[in-house]
């Protein structure tokens, strides 16, 4: 979903409609209902609900249920342990028996609400990990004093063992620090759950490059609806479909889509919904394209919806899509403005400052409307876009057109909620009263126009060269695409055509949008980012790129001037016409970058202008914003649509407006949880890290370094259960040379040589991951006549063999590569396990033998370098 996000700093200036009579709503309705951390929670109304027919209401109700059934998918996509964390929080909130009035518990509630808001443990916008302002000890007491039956425990797992796993996931500041990272290898340093196994960026590119067809005029969206998995060195996709990943949730979505189809308004809706069901059933991306083609050609229906894996913003590679849904119906009043714009799409395309090679010769099927949303879900909830343009496939947009919408009731809710706050970002960051007056007079009109231009025409403008593959800009594609659409809107806001078409009242109007945009891009949006952090979110990068590029290019002519008054920084536009020219120049360049697939120039633009933040300016903005007492981010509670039953028959559907954010999410957790939580972290088998193999009778190469590397890995993955496999030989063991074997005496029971290296006791941070003979030490070779290189049948403290005690996914390290490590690995591999081999954590008897063994193993398992 090419989308535009509300900027809360100017929300008080916006209105849902720019002309005409306001739709009937409850004038006493309270919009702002909760504030915590850096967030505010609002409600939105559904005007004109009573004007819908019973059939239309029923259709919306079923579509809304389909939307809510996919809720868990997004949380799981955002991070593999999000559902485990969320269900733990839900269990505490629903069953904790202790004091709920103390400050610690209230701080816990704030954390829980933040996790619900962000659909996971990472901030929904900044993407860094959030932490509860409570101690680990207090958290443990919350868990232990809650109903264990409600906790997401694995079969046979104790509460204490579960705490060993979940505590570092929540509290460790270095573990899973960023949902989507731009540092070094963007796959390995990101926590999004689109990739599993030790996969790097190059492997992802090679996997999908091998699938793409050269000069394909109608390419599918490769990788859009799947997780890329590396198992035993081989890559494959787990596809999201009925009999695949997220199958249970998808079954529920399909159930409600079928119910909706029974009461659809027309055959067009039934047709594209059936195609969507086929796509969900098969996972076939050609079916996805067929659905989008049918969907985009329906511009007549009153009711519409989006339901699927749509946007790739969260994927570091810009390929894999998060799940989202909205349900809506047409706002007839607001649609008039949008229809004027879409009717003139060809004029805008022909007159843009873009190279003619990159312009569409014919703009097809451009439709635009204002909509009233009734249900938000997935990546649109609780923090939704205010504008949408779909579908995303460039060839479908070129050949069949696109749908663009402005969500009018959400814009109205943002506006009304901002008016309930006493202070204004505008008054703080605008340089003059003249600027304030200009924005108060025209921002509501200009911003809605910019949103329409951005969504209706901006994303749909231009074309790729025939030789350019979609997705060529990779991790920079989202920021550059949003910048391209914003620039299109900014350039045309100032065109006299807007007044000629009757959309703007005069040529002063656009100046309000220019000042708002530059002020936000250079300054006010920085209030949303933690000090010292970079800009990572695509829309924020887009605004920063445009603003700082124009500031730099306009320095010679003083187009945008940086002023300081009373110790406060301001940015003032001195020449609006020249600024429009700069917008046009940058639009032309970014269109060229996209059309030609110029990755290096796209990278340069984003990295130069859209990532780094001036620390002094950042500190100033944060201090000024904090003094206002406003929250920089906002989201919503959904209305509840409830059947009204009389005489056993549904006679109406009533809209209720709940005001408790926490309760809504707890209710959703009880009624719409269809994805199993995952806390089956890989188990780490540490083989024979014993003194005799390190500095004793059988001292091995790289052994000391291997100990250091294994400890480092364990500390970087504290949630992974560690199992220590050890030789445990009697003094007369048959493997010893004195008793007919080939080895010197080693690892004898009760000797230093048979002890695990002390670093695993002293340097491993998580106590649960240290060696403990009562818990995680498995012994082999304990019988006189048993060689037993492999740990597969090593015996644990409860008498069971290791093969009976571990899950499918294993990490293996230890000594020695050619013998005990290889034999352990091969037995588990042959038993169907997925193996990752920690290469730096290996010691060896002979370097040549190690190298030969690694050549063999690299072909059959995944290696961690």
PLM region spans:
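C-terminal motif of bacterial Sec signal peptides marking the signal peptidase cleavage site
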Residues: 14-16
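Long, well-structured alpha-helical subdomains associated
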Residues: 45, 490-593
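Active-site recognition of the HExxH zinc-binding catalytic motif
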Residues: 53, 266, 449-463, 485
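An active-site-proximal "capping" alpha-helix that borders the catalytic cofactor pocket
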Residues: 53, 266, 478-495, 707-714
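Contiguous, non-catalytic segments that form substrate-binding/exosite surfaces or channel walls
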Residues: 110-229, 236-435, 443
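Post-HEXXH active-site segment of zinc metalloproteases
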Residues: 462-483
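Extended, compositionally biased alpha-helical segments that mediate assembly or anchoring
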Residues: 579-678
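Active-site acidic carboxylates
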Residues: 677-779, 808, 833-836, 845-858, ...
């Amino acid at each position: 979903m090419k989308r535009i996000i509300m900027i809360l700093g100017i929300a008080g200036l916006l209105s849902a409609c720019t002309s005409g009579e306001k739709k009937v709503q409850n004038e006493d309705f309270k919009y702002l209902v909760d504030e915590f951390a850096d967030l505010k929670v609002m409600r939105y109304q559904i005007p004109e609900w009573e004007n819908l027919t019973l059939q239309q209401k029923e259709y919306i109700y079923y579509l809304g249920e389909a939307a809510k059934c996919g809720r868990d998918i997004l949380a799981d996509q955002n991070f593999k342990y999000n559902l485990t964390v969320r269900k733990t929080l839900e269990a505490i909130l629903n069953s904790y028996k202790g004091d709920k009035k103390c400050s610690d518990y209230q701080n816990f509630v704030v954390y829980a609400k933040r996790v619900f808001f962000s659909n996971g443990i990472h901030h929904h916008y900044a993407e860094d990990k959030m932490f509860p302002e409570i101690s680990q000890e207090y958290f443990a007491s919350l868990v232990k004093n809650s109903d264990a039956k409600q906790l997401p425990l694995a079969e046979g797992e104790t509460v204490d063992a579960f705490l060993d796993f979940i505590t570092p996931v929540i509290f460790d500041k270095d573990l899973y620090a960023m949902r989507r990272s731009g540092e070094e290898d963007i796959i390995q340093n990101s926590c999004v759950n689109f990739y599993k196994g030790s996969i790097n960026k190059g492997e992802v590119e090679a996997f999908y490059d091998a699938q793409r067809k050269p000069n394909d005029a109608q390419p599918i969206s490769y990788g859009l609806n799947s997780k890329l998995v590396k198992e035993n060195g081989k890559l494959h996709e787990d596809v999201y479909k009925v009999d695949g990943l997220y199958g249970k949730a998808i079954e529920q979505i399909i159930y409600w889509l079928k119910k909706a189809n029974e009461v659809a308004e027309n055959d067009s809706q039934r047709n594209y919904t059936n195609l969507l069901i086929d796509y969900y059933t098969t996972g076939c991306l050609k079916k996805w394209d067929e659905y989008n083609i049918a969907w985009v050609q329906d511009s007549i229906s009153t009711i519409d919806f989006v339901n699927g894996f749509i946007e790739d913003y969260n994927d570091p590679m810009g390929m894999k899509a998060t799940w989202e849904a909205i349900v809506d119906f047409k706002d007839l009043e607001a649609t008039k403005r949008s229809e004027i714009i879409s009717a003139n799409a060809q004029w805008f395309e022909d007159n843009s400052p873009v190279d003619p090679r990159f312009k569409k010769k014919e703009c097809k099927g451009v439709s635009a409307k204002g909509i009233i949303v009734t249900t938000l879900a997935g990546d649109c909830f609780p923090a939704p876009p205010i504008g949408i343009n779909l579908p995303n496939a460039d060839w479908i947009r070129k050949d069949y057109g696109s749908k663009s919408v402005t969500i009018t009731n959400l814009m109205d809710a943002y506006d009304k909620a901002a008016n309930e706050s006493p202070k204004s970002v505008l008054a703080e960051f605008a340089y003059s009263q003249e600027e304030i007056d200009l924005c108060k007079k025209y921002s509501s009109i200009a911003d809605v126009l910019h949103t329409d231009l951005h969504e209706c025409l901006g994303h749909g403008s231009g074309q790729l060269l025939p030789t350019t593959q979609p997705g060529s800009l990779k991790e920079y594609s989202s920021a550059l695409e949003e910048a391209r659409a914003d620039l299109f809107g900014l350039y045309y806001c100032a065109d006299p055509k807007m007044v000629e078409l009757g959309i703007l009242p005069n040529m002063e109007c656009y100046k309000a949008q220019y000042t708002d945009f530059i002020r936000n891009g250079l300054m006010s949006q920085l209030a949303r980012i933690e000090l010292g952090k970079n800009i990572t979110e695509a829309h924020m990068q887009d605004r920063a790129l445009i603003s700082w590029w124009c500031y730099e290019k306009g320095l010679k002519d003083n187009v945008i001037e940086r002023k300081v008054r009373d110790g406060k920084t301001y940015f003032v536009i001195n020449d609006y016409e020249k600024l429009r020219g700069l917008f046009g120049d940058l639009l032309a360049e970014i269109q060229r970058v996209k059309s030609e697939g110029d990755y290096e120039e796209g990278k340069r633009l984003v990295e130069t202008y859209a990532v780094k933040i001036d620390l002094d300016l950042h500190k100033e903005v944060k201090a000024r914003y904090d003094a206002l007492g406003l929250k920089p981010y906002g989201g919503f509670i959904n209305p509840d649509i409830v059947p009204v039953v009389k005489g056993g028959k549904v006679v109406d559907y009533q809209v209720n407006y709940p005001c408790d954010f926490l309760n809504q999410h707890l209710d959703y957790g009880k009624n719409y949880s269809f994805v199993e939580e995952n806390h089956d972290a890989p188990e780490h088998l540490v083989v024979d890290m014993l003194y005799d193999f390190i500095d004793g009778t059988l001292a091995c190469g790289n052994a000391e370094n291997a100990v250091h590397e294994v400890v480092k890995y364990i500390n970087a993955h504290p949630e992974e259960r560690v199992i220590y496999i050890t030789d445990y030989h009697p003094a007369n063991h048959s493997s010893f040379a004195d008793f007919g074997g080939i080895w010197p005496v080693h690892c004898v029971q009760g000797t230093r040589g048979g002890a695990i290296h002390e670093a695993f006791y002293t340097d491993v941070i998580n106590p649960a991951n240290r060696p403990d003979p009562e818990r995680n030490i498995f012994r082999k070779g304990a019988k006189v006549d048993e060689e037993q290189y492999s740990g597969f049948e090593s015996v644990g403290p409860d008498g069971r063999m290791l093969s009976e005690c571990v899950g499918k996914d294993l990490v293996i390290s230890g000594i020695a590569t050619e013998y005990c490590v290889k034999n352990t690995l091969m037995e588990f591999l042959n038993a169907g396990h997925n193996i990752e081999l920690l290469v730096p954590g290996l010691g060896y008897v002979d370097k040549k033998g190690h190298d030969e063994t690694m050549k063999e193993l690299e072909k059959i398992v995944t290696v961690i370098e």
